[in-house]
Amino acid sequence: MPKIGIIGGSGVYGIFEPKETVKVHTPYGRPSAPVEIGEIEGVEVAFIPRHGKYHEFPPHEVPYRANIWALHELGVERVIAVNAVGSLKEEYKPGDIVIIDQFIDFTKKREYTFYNGPRVAHISMADPFCPELRRIFIETAKELNLPVHEKGTYICIEGPRFSTRAESRMFRQFADVIGMTLVPEVNLARELGMCYVNISTVTDYDVWAEKPVDAQEVLRVMKENEEKVQKLLKRAIPKIPEERKCGCADVLKTMFV
């Protein structure tokens, strides 16, 4: 079974021809969609469309626990998450790729943990993303001459609404990009000892910029971002070593009370 899982949206559709589709039943309900299993450049991978096959789940209703649990149950050890984000900084331009290294959680009512009792866990999130996967994707993006930022702080809001201008200006003080789907996905992967890397693609500037958003321009950028992400995945995934040496699973040794 695959040891690499991808969670993403339309930008990842069609990257491989599924060899198998697996319906996984979890203690947390059904995942967003059946898990598709196929190969990318000879490497077996599993894929879950985060928002569902027909984009039926808004960000605050995505079954995050079921998605992560399903991948873990299939034997996945590494999760590659792809998100579209808005930019909070001038230098993070539409069309850029950001390999996120930190996040701020501004969500409000999601299921954040697998441990709601009777067992209690406190997971360290000081460095929430896998250093080994981050290095591979940064190096590969540079090899491909893609516009990549090696670091970025992602602020995750509840959604599905977008920010007010006042909120956007406040968020600019703390973060570089803004989105709605990183949390609790990253927390949950860490609780199961899985490696997790986030590839964020910038579609536009958030409303702080006070520039009119051109819908056609956003669609054009999104299409270009899809091509960049697929190119990046196809080049980077074969470089991921079979054995994990990152220490991501070590957090399990100290998380339980």
UniProtKB/Swiss-Prot annotation:
It is an enzyme of class 2 (transferase). One of its GO terms (molecular function) is S-methyl-5-thioadenosine phosphorylase activity. The lineage of its organism: Archaea, Methanobacteriati, Methanobacteriota, Thermococci, Thermococcales. It comes from Pyrococcus furiosus (strain ATCC 43587 / DSM 3638 / JCM 8422 / Vc1). Homohexamer. Dimer of a homotrimer. Catalyzes the reversible phosphorylation of S-methyl-5'-thioadenosine (MTA) to adenine and 5-methylthioribose-1-phosphate. Involved in the breakdown of MTA, a major by-product of polyamine biosynthesis. Responsible for the first step in the methionine salvage pathway after MTA has been generated from S-adenosylmethionine. Has broad substrate specificity with 6-aminopurine nucleosides as preferred substrates. InterPro entries: MTAP (IPR010044), Nucleoside_phosphorylase_d (IPR000845), Nucleoside_phosphorylase_sf (IPR035994), Purine_phosphorylase-2_CS (IPR018099). Gene3D superfamilies: Nucleoside phosphorylase domain. This is S-methyl-5'-thioadenosine phosphorylase. Phosphate binds at S10, R50, H51, T181. The keyword Transferase applies. One of its GO terms (biological process) is purine ribonucleoside salvage. Optimum pH is 7.4. Active from pH 5 to 10. Belongs to the PNP/MTAP phosphorylase family. MTAP subfamily. SUPFAM superfamilies: Purine and uridine phosphorylases. It catalyses: S-methyl-5'-thioadenosine + phosphate = 5-(methylsulfanyl)-alpha-D-ribose 1-phosphate + adenine. GO terms for cellular component: cytosol. Substrate binds at M180, D204, Y205, D206. Optimum temperature is 125 degrees Celsius. Thermostable up to 137 degrees Celsius. The keyword Heme does not apply. The gene is mtnP. Its EC number is 2.4.2.28. The record marks S163, A215 as: Important for substrate specificity.
